[in-house]
Amino acid sequence: MTLLEQYIDCMRKGDECALADLFSKDGILHDSSWTQAGEDTLHLSGKMAVEMMFHHKFGYNGGPFPISGVKFMEENVAWYFIVYHDSVVPVVAYLSSVTEDGKIDRLNILPM
């Protein structure tokens, strides 16, 4: 599986530890799709921040956020629908940078 496929798989499973392991030590996740559900943009720096935030997010949600309609445009770009609380949000995920050892350096999630 590509990194982006693994990311979506971890999100679907609600596995914050495996999700964090996809990121480099200082990897960045920038997710502005949360604004479509009335929340602040999520900007996380570092795999520990990713693990801690999604431990909280999955716990508060009662499990993973449903993801459907995934379409990979290319290896580093995917479109999908994600449900935050009661809001269905169409997003594009763009893996903009990967480290030499194959970890996510920067992943941007944007609402469409």
Residue ranges and their predicted role:
Residues 14-17, 67-68:
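Intrinsically disordered, low-complexity boundary segments flanking structured domains
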Residues 2, 45, 85-87:
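Short glycine/proline-enriched coil/turn segments at helix->beta-strand junctions
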